[in-house]
């Protein structure tokens, strides 16, 4: 099977299907019993971590451990992570549970009747929410996944990777993995001043740099001599109590080093993970990158707005630049969706921007 065919038939599947993990669903009687014990923020940290490690196969499952989140917890099944904004619930990522329990836990979660929207959910969950609960599920980006087993630096589109690696070597840049470096926050403060959304970090859709729970994260740094030039934090992606992938969720770089070191630092980390036997590498979300064709459960109005934002909104956020950067790694793009009740969810969009610290 060639690489593109393999990507189409394998990489667009959930991680549990890719890895072959088999987890039996809870019997129906047990589901009903556990539903009576469901509640908000019921699990202890250890209990939540146990579900995360078993079912946290979405690239944002770990990010949903960020401060300020609430959780709809169903003992024996799993949880849904969300935040409140202006009286509505905003879910981040797929439910952390077995695939077979998704419909049940979403149904229980929606029973309180509060306005609810879903952000950065996978295509199977988006389709489920549309078909079973009457939501619009609209694509709002792609997530890129790289198969490390077949990945290398060959090919025309990877020329920029090879060039950046050669330049870093020539300039005496060295890379290292460390647990913590004291200059992280200082470099972050300097980096934020150069961003289009200045002097504040994007939240919710991107987890904060400092988390109360960071077990399993990996940090890679770039130096020239003793000068810290940049770093990337990688969060683990789990399935059946094993790390099956990593995703870069925090990256910061010195504005004093114009040549750029994101590419060579990423390649260094990817080669490290590959040497450890890791099969996949998630590159995370490229927002506003959507198909030209609308699915039957998408809002055509929202989809059109997203296309226009990608085309004309780069003065607010570098949508095109981010997608171009990730495309150089030649991974497979998987659709990412938001789900909303209204055909034109203006309040939900404004609430999401507020949650994300953009407004």
Region locations from a protein language model:
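Short hydrophobic short-linear motifs embedded
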Residues: 10-13, 18, 26-28
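A short acidic, glycine-rich active-site loop
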Residues: 306-316
